[in-house]
C-alpha cells in the first residue's frame, strides 16, 4: 500500500514579500530549498502560524542567502508579508520516509535541523 508521507519541512519561516501581481508560486531561497530537500517546481503545502491560512502552490528557487520568501499571485491574498509559515512537501511511498526538516529564525536563517 502506498502512503503520502512528509518528506520536507521548512518550519517558522517568515514571508518577506507578498506580490499579488506575479503569476503564482512561493519563492524560497535555493539554499533553504536544498537544506529541506524541496525541488524547483515541487508542489508544496504552505500553512500560516500567524493567521491560520493554508494553501498549495509550487516552489520556485530564489537567490540563495537572501532570506527572501515571497508569496506570489493569488496566494499573496491569503498569506501576507510578516506571517510566520511552514512549507511542506510530501512523497508517495510504500516504505517509511525520513523527512528533512529545518527551523528558521525571523531572518529565514536555518537555526536547527530536525532529522
Question: Where do the language-model regions lie?
Answer:
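Well-ordered alpha/beta subsegment
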Residues: 92, 99-115
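Long, charged amphipathic helices and adjacent flexible linkers at domain junctions
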Residues: 1-3, 115
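Compact, glycine-rich, soluble single-domain proteins
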Residues: 3-5, 10, 14-16, 20-95, ...
